[in-house]
Amino acid sequence: MEEKPSGPIPDMLATAEPSSSETDKEVLSPAVPAAAPSSSMSEEPGPEQAATPPVWERGGAGGMQQGSSPAPDSCQPGPGPSPGLTSIVSGTSEDLRPPRRRPPPGKQIPCSSPGCCLSFPSVRDLAQHLRTHCPPTQSLEGKLFRCSALSCTETFPSMQELVAHSKLHYKPNRYFKCENCLLRFRTHRSLFKHLHVCAEHAQSPAPPPPPALDREPPAPERPPEVDPASAPGLPFPLLEPFTTPAPAPTGPFLPYLNPAPFGLSPPRLRPFLAAAPGPPASSAAVWKKSQGAGSSPRRPQGGSDAPSGACR
């Protein structure tokens, strides 16, 4: 018996090879037209080539332009804007717009006046309603305006006439006048300061005028002059305080008071002078006499060389 080869049958191999070659041709066929544009791109285009319109192949459903790679229909943009871009632009434009102040349809706008519960569908109706709450300022029929000034009983039918009349009572003054003494001041503050002083003077009674003197007042008696030599106990009699009483006042003014009775400088000097030992009161005269004798060119009798001021 002949052994059958374990390998494949040659007829089956022959049939299998054409199928594989066909698939290779189908795969390589699209690459052939793709290589053509590369060769055409290497050549310099002439004027005739630039003028010729593009040639479309008839193969395929829609055809394909010669020298261009196939592209899906979804990737080719149309002449108008794409729907995705329009949605983005519309979204940004709506965000940039200011919010609408108009209320949505069907919403009622309530009245803001206290005690009013009415609401209106539009702003115009609300504005017309607000006029009933705030009427324009005008004089009411039959109402009279009275002047508020004291001792004035004038009445006027309108507010404008009352304001014009009030200028007569309260005219703008450039100064402030005191009613008591009729003094004028530039500021209101200075007038208030003056009113305190003016009120005190008005309350205090005026001093009576001094009586007229028919005769001349007597001359004040002078104290007897004391001889300074008759008071040996006082070394400085001029520093002794003045003990004579002052004359009685003859008018409304206070008399002049001697400052010596108040015990200023003379009482302070007295104990110091009394405690200090010193020469008697006649020592000053003796010293002047001896000084005058020493200055003379004559010498004392006896011819002694002792100084003239020495004690014998």
Swiss-Prot record:
Residue numbers spanned by region Disordered: 1-110, 203-312
Keyword annotations of the record: DNA-binding, Metal-binding, Nucleus, Repeat, Transcription, Transcription regulation, Zinc, Zinc-finger
Pfam families: zf-C2H2_8
Signal peptide: none
Zinc finger (C2H2-type): 109-133, 145-169, 176-201
InterPro entries for this protein: ZN414 (IPR039882), Znf-C2H2_ribbon (IPR031799), Znf_C2H2_type (IPR013087)
Any one GO cellular component localisation term in the record: nucleus
MF GO annotations: DNA binding; DNA-binding transcription factor activity; zinc ion binding
Subcellular location: Nucleus
Bias-annotated ranges (Polar residues): 84-93
Biased composition (Low complexity): 29-48, 227-243, 265-285
Matching PROSITE patterns: ZINC_FINGER_C2H2_1, ZINC_FINGER_C2H2_2
Stretches with biased composition (Basic and acidic residues): 213-225
Family annotation (PANTHER family): ZINC FINGER PROTEIN 414
Role, per record: May be involved in transcriptional regulation.
Family: Belongs to the krueppel C2H2-type zinc-finger protein family.
Name used for this protein in its record: Zinc finger protein 414
Native source organism of the sequence: Homo sapiens
